[in-house]
């Protein structure tokens, strides 16, 4: 884990579940270990990104429309307490 003392939201829990799914996949002899890829849409895209950056076994992440706090390049135009989305990511 990268941030062992941090509080986590739903995306972190889902990313943890993805890590366990990768464990299960890698126990199958027909799975190519260096070819694991993730995709997700909206909140699923954010969670796929988080899972991919916290597990080196995931080779490719392809988020779709992951929005604010996800893969989009954006500037914080309004004053907020946190630059991350308030409904799923780090807060």
Can you describe what each PLM-predicted range is?
Residues 1-27, 70-77:
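Cap/lid segment of the alpha/beta-hydrolase catalytic domain
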Residues 13-20, 38-41, 63, 84-91:
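Extended catalytic-interface subdomain
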Residues 28-30, 55:
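Alpha-helix termination/capping residues and helix-transition junctions
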Residues 30-42:
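Alpha/beta-hydrolase fold nucleophile elbow
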Residues 33, 59-60:
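Secondary-structure boundary/capping signal
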Residues 40-52:
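Glycine-rich nucleophile elbow surrounding the catalytic serine of serine-hydrolase chemistry
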Residues 53-59:
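Conserved hydrolase catalytic core segment
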Residues 60-91:
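Mobile cap/lid helix-loop segments that gate and shape the active-site cleft of serine hydrolases
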């Amino acid at each position: 884990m990268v941030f062992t003392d941090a509080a986590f939201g739903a995306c972190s829990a889902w990313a943890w579940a993805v890590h366990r799914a990768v464990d299960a996949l890698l126990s199958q002899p027909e799975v190519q270990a260096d070819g694991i890829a993730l995709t997700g849409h909206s909140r699923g895209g954010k969670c796929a990104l988080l899972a991919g950056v916290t597990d080196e076994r995931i080779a490719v992440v392809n988020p779709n429309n992951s929005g604010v706090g996800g893969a989009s390049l954006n500037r914080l135009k309004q004053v907020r307490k946190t630059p991350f989305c308030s409904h799923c990511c780090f807060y």
